[in-house]
Design a protein with these regions (language model features):
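Cytoplasmic-side transmembrane-helix entry/capping segments in multi-pass membrane proteins
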Residues: 77-88, 103-110, 129-138
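Short, highly charged, low-complexity non-transmembrane loops/tails of multi-pass membrane proteins
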Residues: 178-196
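Hydrophobic, membrane-inserted alpha-helices
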Residues: 37-47, 62-68, 85-93, 141-150
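Hydrophobic alpha-helical transmembrane segments in multi-pass integral membrane proteins
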Residues: 93-105, 143-159
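Hydrophobic core segments of alpha-helical transmembrane domains in multi-pass membrane proteins
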Residues: 56-65, 103-113, 158-169
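C-terminal ends of transmembrane helices
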Residues: 64-75, 116-126, 174-175, 179
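Short helix-perturbing small/polar motifs within transmembrane alpha-helices
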Residues: 86-124
Length: 196
């Protein structure tokens, strides 16, 4: 769905100004990511509001997205599957129990998992220099520490929840789960007929 919109928009931009724009595939990739993020964020805002936890939902989402950028992770091939999966995972994590001891445990587990497993990139993804990845990993660890400080000062647990979600997805079990989900979402349908 998003891919079709991205292709259509990239086609229009290339028709308007073919000389001064990025290559078509770069435009499609960028627009697909943009549409995916907007859809996911809008969906989470709406559902968070409906279930009565809009601020908590935004906290979890922002923390998850920041760490995802810093630490990578397994990916789904279809952007709509990515949006739906991300939304379901975030909405599951807003229901985690809250207490000072539990939040400290979530924080410690997140810190340990990110220190151990980050970064993760799929084989087809571009890997940056080791120095750059170490800087991103340090930034991720600082972010996790910052999430606990936010919880401690402002009683906002969602940032810790988002960190835990991303940390769990970096584990071998989390990566295996996403890969199995990707295989499931790719079976049958128009998309697989075109690519297979």
């Amino acid at each position: 769905m998003f891919e079709k919109w991205a292709v259509a928009l990239a086609d229009q931009i290339k028709k308007i100004n073919p000389e001064e724009t990025e290559p078509h595939d770069v435009l499609v990739f960028g627009f697909t990511i943009l549409f995916n993020l907007l859809f996911t964020f809008l969906l989470l805002l709406i559902v968070g509001w409906i279930i009565g936890v809009p601020l908590l939902t935004v906290e979890v989402t922002l923390s998850f997205m920041i760490l995802r950028i810093l630490t990578g992770g397994a990916h789904l091939d279809r952007s709509i599957a990515c949006s739906i999966t991300s939304s379901l995972l975030v909405l599951t994590f807003v229901w985690l129990p809250v207490s000072p001891i539990l939040l400290f445990c979530y924080f410690v587990v997140s810190l340990m998992l990110i220190a151990r497993f980050a970064p993760y990139y799929e084989p087809h993804q571009i890997k940056h220099s080791k120095q750059w990845e170490q800087k991103k990993k340090r930034a991720a660890i600082l972010w996790v520490i910052f999430t606990f400080v936010i919880y401690y000062i402002f009683s906002a647990p969602g940032f810790v929840f988002g960190a835990l979600l991303q940390a769990l997805l970096l584990t071998p079990a989390g990566i295996k789960f996403i890969h199995k989900l990707n295989n499931f979402t790719m079976k049958g349908g128009e998309y697989c007929e075109k690519s297979g």
